[in-house]
Every structure is written in structure tokens, then in C-alpha cells.
Swiss-Prot record:
Comment text on domains: The N-terminal domain is essential for RNAP assembly and basal transcription, whereas the C-terminal domain is involved in interaction with transcriptional regulators and with upstream promoter elements.
Class of the enzyme per the UniProt entry, highest EC level: transferase
Gene: rpoA
EC number: 2.7.7.6
Catalyzed reaction equations: RNA(n) + a ribonucleoside 5'-triphosphate = RNA(n+1) + diphosphate
Protein name: DNA-directed RNA polymerase subunit alpha
Length: 332
């Protein structure tokens, strides 16, 4: 355990207690009083809403035109089959989408293990029941798998050309999150003579496509990334962009193409040898308005895009361009 300059305790590394293959407890201590609820609530919300995963988003079933179609020899109605498909636990090793198929001859039970997969896709709950065939009939499906996070209703993912979509393509509400349940508790902890400290205990259950430790680590990374922007309050001077880690802020080394300006604005800047964001922010409004074919509308666009990144025109940079940045707009 270490203590920072302002005497705020830094907790030890997390302790992992695996309860089952899909459930574990993560313990973090010691924490300053009140930090248990602060961190526990934040981690719980991120774990439930923002951990990426895979889900079945679209289904085509031979002979089924819509969700209310009746299928001869199928015990369940189509809506129930779609609900069962939403609970299939899927993991992909690479890529963001895939199309799988399922074919089964009845009578008998159809499970997730009947889905045909390749080396890139795993089904973690193969015994999960999808439907029952009561007669000597076959069922054939095509399943679209996509990567995402959180919960996305079907209506939110319908494309503008929805009216022309193929008849029989059923769009599902998708729950991408691999985290099924998260609860946390704050218990008392002590260090030497201090007895007013917190111990955070997170109880997390997943669908098996990710282990609890990795889920908590991912949630912590997301929180850390979101909070990192507040560091600028301390380290950035209002009139100048300060280098990070005794170097140049990586954002300033990004090409102006990353700003996604209109083609007209981008071409005007490049014609004036403005290739990097660092080149651009050192220009004043007056200087840019002197650029041929760049008017007030383009200037407004540039200012708005920079403001979204916490930057502005007329900023001062020391030692620009840094070593490795060539005048022709390529990193050396």
C-alpha cells in the first residue's frame, strides 16, 4: 500500500475469488471512506452498460415472413424462438460481424450447439434450447452476429432503406453486454490504527464469453479514459497547448484529415501547407481568411471542429514542428 502526496490511500491490487465459471467476486481495499460507494457505483454502471460483446441481431427462417408466422411442426411460436436466440452466448476471436446458419431435422430439440460455426466463432452455452420440433420437419435459419455494447432495440438499428429490406429478415432487439448481473457491497476495513476505511466487494456474473476479472479491467479502463480529459484542467495553459510527457501532444500530430472537414476546407488548408492539427491551431482567424477560397463559412466549420477537441485558433506551440514531421505533410 502506498500513500500519495495528498495522503489519499492507494488500494492494493484486486483480489479475485472465482465462485463458478461465470461468477466471481472482486475485492479492492483499502479505500478512503466514501470511495467504496463512489467507485463501486461507477464500475457497476459501466459494467452493465459499456462492456462490448456479440449478439444475434438478424434472423431469417425458411418459410417465415414475419414474427407472427405459424410454422407447422414447431412447438414454440416464432416470437418465442427469437427470444431464445437472444440468449445465445457468442464469442468471436476477430472481426465485428459474421453470418452463421442452423439446420435441424425433427422431431427433437434444437439447441445452440446446432448452430454451425467456424474457427472464429464460439458458442458458450451449447445446451441452450432454441426450440422444439414435434414432427418430421426441418428448420433452417441464417443468423447475423454483430459486435456492440449495451442494449439496442431493433427500431434503433433499422436502416434508412428499411422499406426495401428482404421479406423474412427479422431484426432482433440486441443485448450485447456479456455481463448478466453486478452487485457491490462496501464493508469496513482498517490499516494499522485507521478503522474508518472502505473495502469494496463486487459480485459479477457474465454469460461466459468474458471472465469477471477481464470485465472489471475493461470497465476500469473505460472509466480511466473518460476521466483522463479532466487532467487538462491542471496541465493546459489557456493560451498555449502544452506537450504531454515532455513531448508533443499526439493529437497535434494527427493529420487535418482526422478533423473530417469538408473537402473544400481541407484542400484550402493543404494548399497553404497546413497538414497537421498542430499547423492549424497556430494560425489566426485573420491569417486563415487570407487563404484563397476559404471563406467565413469554412472558418466557422474549422473553429467548431477544433472546439470539440478543446483546441482553438491562435494557440502557441514551442519547438514546432517537432523532429520527424516533414513540411510535405508526412511523418518522418
Amino acid at each position: 500500500m502506498t500513500v500519495t502526496a495528498n495522503q489519499v490511500l492507494r488500494p492494493r491490487g484486486p483480489q479475485i475469488e472465482r465462485l463458478t465459471d461465470t461468477r466471481a467476486k472482486v475485492v479492492i481495499e483499502p479505500l478512503e471512506r466514501g470511495y467504496g460507494h463512489t467507485l463501486g457505483n461507477a464500475l457497476r454502471r459501466v459494467l452493465l452498460s459499456s462492456i462490448p460483446g456479440f449478439a444475434i441481431t438478424e434472423v431469417e427462417i425458411d418459410g417465415v415472413l414475419h414474427e407472427y408466422t405459424t410454422v407447422e411442426g414447431l412447438q414454440e411460436d416464432v416470437l418465442e424462438v427469437l427470444l431464445n436466440l437472444k440468449d445465445v452466448a457468442i464469442r468471436m476471436h476477430s472481426g465485428d460481424s459474421a453470418t452463421l446458419s442452423l439446420s435441424k431435422q425433427g422431431p427433437g430439440v434444437v439447441t445452440a450447439a446446432d448452430i454451425k460455426v467456424d474457427h472464429n466463432v464460439e458458442i458458450l452455452n451449447g445446451d441452450h434450447v432454441i426450440c422444439h420440433l414435434t414432427k418430421d420437419t426441418a428448420i433452417n435459419m441464417r443468423l447475423k452476429i454483430e459486435r456492440g455494447f449495451g442494449y439496442q432495440p431493433a427500431a434503433a438499428r433499422r436502416r434508412p432503406d428499411e422499406e426495401t429490406r428482404a421479406i423474412g429478415r427479422l431484426v432482433l432487439d440486441a443485448s450485447f453486454s456479456p455481463v448478466r448481473r453486478v452487485a457491490y457491497a462496501v464493508e469496513a476495513a482498517r490499516v494499522e490504527q485507521r478503522t474508518d476505511l472502505d473495502k469494496l466487494v463486487i459480485d459479477i456474473e457474465t454469460n461466459g464469453t468474458i471472465d469477471a476479472e477481464e470485465a472489471v479491467r475493461t470497465a476500469a479502463d473505460i472509466l480511466s479514459d473518460q476521466l483522463s480529459v479532466f487532467g487538462d484542467f491542471t496541465h493546459r495553459d489557456r493560451g498555449a497547448a502544452k506537450p504531454a510527457n515532455n513531448g508533443v501532444d499526439p493529437v497535434l500530430l494527427r493529420p487535418i484529415d482526422d478533423l473530417e472537414l469538408t473537402v473544400r476546407s481541407a484542400n484550402c488548408l493543404k494548399a497553404e501547407s497546413i497538414y497537421y492539427i498542430g499547423d492549424l491551431i497556430q494560425k489566426t482567424e485573420v491569417e486563415l481568411l487570407k487563404t484563397p477560397n476559404l471563406g467565413k463559412k469554412s472558418l466557422t466549420e474549422i473553429k467548431e471542429v477544433l472546439a470539440q477537441r478543446g483546441l482553438s485558433l491562435g494557440m502557441k506551440l514551442e519547438n514546432w514542428p517537432p523532429a520527424g514531421v516533414a513540411s510535405h505533410g508526412m511523418l518522418g
